[in-house]
């Protein structure tokens, strides 16, 4: 475990300044935004930007964090092992994001660890289907309910373990990410495993929050994006220079302009990139929270 950062005395109050940046950036981008950004510099989440944070919205691939939470809770309870395997059957392959759909043949034996990595790192939709063999939609929702999340839900398919990804809110997503970042959602081992995946940028999504950053800077962000129809979301954790969690951001948007453009030039995605740079440049103090990652090792290709 890496050392935690220590709060620097006399940290300036930057919340209003960042809120003003957020309002200006999102106004230019267009769309309808639902957002919560929290500063963890005091050891607890303090909102610095909040806009329509309780709006229930289709979470798209951000909901894979909910699936991860249920899965890793079962791992922590000893009911699932990361080394457990399942077969990549052709009829389980899903369209959309991911890598398994590009294979020319199937039948692979895949571990839970492999599926967790592909689900979070390349947002693989097939991985979600295969993980439903280990945690059903009803189990995911039961875990979320037990943890106090009332609006974050997947949609179970009748008579099946599979599910659609469902809905969430910016507030509940922010809370889930804070619990993950602070080590209160999962065990130490599971927290480290998940954050290793979410901070890795050699493969994965960098069009949004992490776009305008060096490799060292990108290693200080654990992110999960989602896109579906007119929705564009980017959520995650920003760590301080020592690897302690400093900020949690939950940017959700619907009614995005240029909705058929899923690339980096979509106006909302461009706004995400600008907001990511603004977060990094604005919040430079250290966090008193425990660190579960080492950004320097991540940036150099290690763990």
Question: Whereabouts are the PLM-identified features?
Answer:
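Short, conserved catalytic-motif segment at the N-terminal edge
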Residues: 30-57
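Active-site-proximal beta-strand/loop segments in catalytic clefts of secreted hydrolases
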Residues: 38-41, 90-91, 119-123, 134, ...
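Mid-domain, small-residue-enriched loop/turn segments at the edges of structured enzyme/sensor domains
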Residues: 32-33, 128-185
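Active-site SXXK
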Residues: 57-86, 249
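Short glycine/serine- and small hydrophobic-enriched flexible loop segments
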Residues: 69-77, 133, 175-182, 280-281
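Structured C-terminal helix/loop/strand segments within mature extracytoplasmic catalytic/sensor domains
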Residues: 5, 10-25, 29, 134, ...
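Conserved catalytic neighborhood of penicillin-recognizing serine enzymes
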Residues: 92-129, 137
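Acidic helix-start/capping segments at beta-turn-to-alpha-helix junctions
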Residues: 40, 82-100, 135-136, 197, ...
């Amino acid at each position: 475990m890496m050392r935690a950062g220590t709060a620097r005395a006399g940290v300036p109050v930057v919340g209003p300044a960042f809120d003003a940046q957020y309002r200006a950036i999102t106004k230019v981008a267009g769309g309808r935004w639902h957002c919560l950004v929290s500063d963890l510099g005091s050891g607890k989440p303090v909102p610095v930007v909040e806009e329509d944070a309780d709006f229930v919205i289709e979470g798209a691939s951000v909901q894979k964090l909910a699936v991860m939470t249920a899965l890793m809770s079962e791992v922590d309870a000893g009911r699932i092992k990361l080394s457990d395997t399942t077969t990549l059957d052709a009829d389980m392959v899903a369209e959309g994001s991911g890598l398994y759909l590009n294979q020319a043949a199937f039948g692979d034996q895949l571990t839970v660890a492999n599926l967790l990595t592909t689900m979070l790192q390349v947002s693989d939709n097939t991985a979600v289907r295969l993980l439903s063999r280990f945690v059903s939609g009803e189990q995911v929702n039961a875990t979320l309910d037990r943890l106090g999340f009332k609006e974050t839900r997947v949609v179970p398919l009748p008579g099946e373990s599979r599910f659609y990804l469902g809905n969430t809110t910016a507030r509940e997503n922010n809370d889930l990410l804070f619990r993950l970042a602070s080590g209160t959602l999962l065990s130490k081992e599971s927290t480290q495993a998940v954050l290793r995946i979410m901070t890795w940028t050699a493969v994965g999504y960098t069009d949004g929050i992490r776009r305008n950053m060096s490799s060292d800077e990108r290693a200080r962000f654990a992110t999960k994006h989602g896109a579906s129809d007119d929705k564009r979301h980017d959520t995650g954790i920003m760590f301080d220079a020592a690897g302690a969690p400093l900020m949690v951001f939950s940017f959700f948007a619907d009614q995005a302009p240029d909705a058929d453009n899923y690339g980096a030039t979509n106006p909302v995605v461009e706004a995400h990139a600008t907001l990511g740079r603004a977060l990094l440049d604005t919040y430079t103090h250290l966090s008193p929270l425990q660190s579960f990652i080492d950004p320097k090792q991540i940036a150099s290709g290690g763990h």
